[in-house]
Amino acid sequence: MTRAFNKIKLHGFNNLTKTLSFNVYDICYAQTFQQRREYIEYIDEEYNAERLTHILTEVAEIIGANILNVARQNYEPQGASVTMLIAEDETEIHQQFTNAEEPGPLPESLVCHLDKSHLTVHTYPESHPENGISTFRADIDVSTCGRVSPLRALNYLIHSLESDIVTMDYRVRGFTRNVYGGKHFIDHAINSIQNFIAEDTKGRYHMIDVNIYQENIFHTKMMLKDFELDDYLFGGNACDLASQEQQAIADRVKNEMLEIFYGKNIPHPDIESSRR
């Protein structure tokens, strides 16, 4: 059961640092060298620095932050990154915020008290040289020094970056004092990151939690339940392939998803023979 938190009267500034690390993976099968190159080019365009800046700007709006500075870069031959420095919103006194353990907006305006916090995103496209599998990873970090948790932006991020696999880590560090001098090492209720995710999203994903409550560390990973081969073929259609080839490709893609989800190599007879 989630422990309820009463409003804490603080002595001075809220010194808690709350960090959300959000990693998404997109997987596809591109059979030829040309298709693999086109996939990388597509991902590079779809997730260029301009679009990533827009996503982080929306995140800043959701958590009620002012953007102080933006640094962004597209890389050769591939990849992009954006870093934002954010600070507290001056309109804070006119708006309300909440740390309720519930899904965040898509998006809607919230306000928090921030000081020298930051948002970052980096992308990592790659492809296997032989077996046709190509993957794309985006890492987003939202770190706030203040009252509103970056988990308020989680729902927006999931819907903005529709992905095959999502890995999330949330931690709270430091402490803040109440007016009597007592320390508070967390200032909001949480027993799972899943409670901040919309029900329709949870219904579409397999989800696993690994939490260390006494250390204020929360980990959730998600993998899509439904599998349609056409969704994973780049530059081709399943109907153009023989049934045996469809099955072989599906096995490769599913194996790739499982390995990423569980974070380890999983033996598969056909795939192992191609690795040797």
From Swiss-Prot:
MF (Gene Ontology): adenosylmethionine decarboxylase activity
Keywords: Autocatalytic cleavage, Decarboxylase, Lyase, Polyamine biosynthesis, Pyruvate, S-adenosyl-L-methionine, Schiff base, Spermidine biosynthesis, Zymogen
Active site per UniProt: 117 (schiff-base intermediate with substrate), 122 (proton acceptor), 145 (proton donor)
PTM info: Is synthesized initially as an inactive proenzyme. Formation of the active enzyme involves a self-maturation process in which the active site pyruvoyl group is generated from an internal serine residue via an autocatalytic post-translational modification. Two non-identical subunits are generated from the proenzyme in this reaction, and the pyruvate is formed at the N-terminus of the alpha chain, which is derived from the carboxyl end of the proenzyme.
InterPro entries xref list: AdoMetDC_fam_prok, S-AdoMet_deCO2ase_bac, S-AdoMet_deCO2ase_core
Annotated pathway: Amine and polyamine biosynthesis; S-adenosylmethioninamine biosynthesis; S-adenosylmethioninamine from S-adenosyl-L-methionine: step 1/1
Cofactor stoichiometry and binding remark: Binds 1 pyruvoyl group covalently per subunit.
Site keyed Cleavage (non-hydrolytic): positions: 116-117
Cofactor (UniProt): pyruvate
GO biological process, one term: spermidine biosynthetic process
EC number: 4.1.1.50
Cysteine pairings via disulfide bonds: none
The keyword S-adenosyl-L-methionine is assigned to this record: yes
Pfam families registered for this protein in UniProt: AdoMet_dc
Residue positions, PTM Pyruvic acid (Ser): 117
UniProt entry tagged with the keyword Lyase: yes
Enzyme class: lyase
Membrane-traversing stretches: none
Oligomer status and interactors: Heterooctamer of four alpha and four beta chains arranged as a tetramer of alpha/beta heterodimers.
Biological function: Catalyzes the decarboxylation of S-adenosylmethionine to S-adenosylmethioninamine (dcAdoMet), the propylamine donor required for the synthesis of the polyamines spermine and spermidine from the diamine putrescine.
Family to which the UniProt record says this protein belongs: Belongs to the prokaryotic AdoMetDC family. Type 2 subfamily.
Protein name, UniProt field: S-adenosylmethionine decarboxylase proenzyme
Gene name linked to the record: speD
